[in-house]
Regions:
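Short, conserved beta-strand element in jelly-roll/cupin
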Residues: 51-53, 100-104, 111, 136-145, ...
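Conserved short histidine dyad/triad with adjacent acidic residue
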Residues: 330-334, 346-364
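Intrinsically disordered, low-complexity basic segments at termini and long loops, enriched
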Residues: 40, 377, 412-430
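Transition-metal
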Residues: 1-227, 300-327, 333, 347-349
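Contiguous mid-protein beta-loop-alpha structural module that forms a pocket-lining wall or clamp
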Residues: 186-307
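A short beta-strand-loop-beta hairpin characteristic of the jelly-roll/cupin
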Residues: 59-65, 71-94, 150-153, 244-263, ...
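Short acidic-glycine-tyrosine-enriched beta hairpin
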Residues: 259-269, 274-278, 350, 378-400
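A short hydrophobic beta-strand segment most commonly corresponding to one strand
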Residues: 107, 137-147, 280-301, 345, ...
Length: 430
């Protein structure tokens, strides 16, 4: 592999309040493993590690042979590193943002807009919606990872309406009846009824929400103290969210949204307009390069209930359908590929057996090119390189090719490394 170039990156850490504290955070551990000078404060949260070129977290290049630049600046000056297809498709920019998240307390009830809505929201309120790009994203668990994702089957929601009168009261009798009747109707009737119920909940008066939530918390707490299980109404989760966000309407969202607990390596893909919330655990997250989020609960940040209720996809599905399983590479037994139906990124997980060191960057680049999409097509890939001690994130973007003018850029997380191969790429089996 000719003319390879390797240089380290300093990647941005976001210390949002919901992050895990100090060295309990995988984000903090990755930061410390890559920077011997990093000082980890045990009383501060380390929520997200950003690897990419987004303006809010553009990685910095650490190389004495290169004048001080961010990764975004360097790519702007060296666009051929993306490969011609990615360069042309995404206007010479890195199309994805890769993160590691360490979640201690719940993130907001949220969704991300499609491209058309993102442009509209950015034009109307750039202070709240800083990007004009869509934000499809994938979360892959590093540890046991809990989250809410997509609307539950209507049958489950109707069951909660029966068992949780406080929930039923906020929805209202008319909307609840409409939802029950939709169970024997067509898909459009279900979508309409679900939209009506969810909108009624999210637009409930604050005073009524607090009253009903306090009643529900008291009832669950009494039953738990008496030794009774409240699992059938997600009692433990309700108490947990209420403790984190007292009186918040988002606590009731658990009765609308699927609850998923991902095992390490399991993933969920969140396309545009899918409601979701991360609750607890560590994950890697890859997304289109955007920071647009429409929120409506479980957050002290700006909420936009009208936009969220209008934009959401109200198609219900069982929780198992929200899982996004990887496919095994046919050419390499160590690779698993998470390939969502968007052009912005693909995630590849490499599990290295034996030893505890990472495989070489050059060999990983070879594997990336060998397992990328068909010749001539753009690809944007994220690799998770597993060893005995830690999973190391490693990013690639480029073009699957047989031409000498194509290229591969790789951005490493755990090792903060960029590999650049500007002249040629290996062929399968090389």
């Amino acid at each position: 592999m000719a003319s390879q170039r390797v240089f380290p990156l300093s990647c941005v850490v976001q210390q949002y309040a919901w992050g895990k504290m100090g060295s309990n955070s995988e984000v903090a551990c990755l930061l410390a493993s890559s920077d011997p000078l990093a000082q980890i404060s045990e009383d501060k949260p380390y929520a997200e590690l950003w690897m990419g070129t987004h303006p809010r977290g553009d990685a910095k290049i650490l190389d004495n042979h290169i004048s001080q630049k961010t990764l975004g600046q360097w790519i702007a000056e060296n666009q051929d590193c993306l490969g011609s297809k990615v360069k042309n498709t995404f206007n010479g920019k890195l199309p994805f943002l890769f993160k590691v998240l360490s979640v201690e307390t719940a993130l907001s009830i949220q969704a991300h807009p499609n491209k058309e809505l993102a442009e509209k929201l950015h034009l109307q309120a750039p202070q709240h919606y800083p990007d004009d790009n869509h934000k499809p994203e994938m979360a892959i668990a590093l540890t046991s990872f809990q989250g809410l994702c997509g609307f539950r089957p209507v049958e489950e929601i109707v069951t909660f309406l029966k068992k949780v009168p406080e929930f039923q009261l906020l929805i209202g009798d008319e909307a609840a009846a409409q939802l029950r009747e939709s169970m024997s109707s067509d898909t459009q009737a279900v979508v309409s009824a679900l939209r009506s119920c969810f909108s009624h909940l999210m637009r409930s008066e604050k005073k009524m929400v607090v009253e009903q939530l306090n009643l529900l918390v008291k009832r669950i707490s009494q039953q738990v103290s008496a030794g009774n299980s409240m699992e059938d109404i997600c009692g433990e989760l309700l108490l947990q969210l209420h403790q984190q966000y007292p009186g918040d309407i988002g606590c009731f969202a658990i009765y609308f949204l699927n609850l998923l607990t991902l095992k390490p390596g399991e993933a969920m893909f969140l396309e545009a307009n899918v409601p979701h919330a991360y609750l607890k655990g560590d994950c890697v997250e890859c997304m289109a390069c955007s920071d647009n989020t429409v929120r409506a609960g479980l957050t002290p940040k700006f909420i936009d209930v009208p936009t969220l209720c209008e934009m959401l996809s109200y198609t219900p599905s069982p929780s198992k359908d929200r899982l996004f399983p990887p496919t095994k590479s046919q050419e390499d037994p160590y690779l698993s590929i998470y390939d969502p139906p968007v052009p912005d990124f693909t995630v590849m997980k490499m599990e290295v057996s034996g030893g505890c060191g990472m495989c070489s960057m050059i060999n990983l680049a070879r594997i990336a090119m060998r397992n990328s999409p068909e010749a001539g097509s753009p690809f944007c890939q994220t690799h998770l390189v597993g060893c005995n001690h830690r999973t190391h994130p490693f990013l690639c973007t480029g073009t699957r090719c047989g031409k000498a003018d194509e290229s591969l850029t790789s951005v490493g997380g755990g090792s903060r490394t960029v590999t650049h191969c500007p002249q040629s790429c290996p062929q399968p089996g090389s």
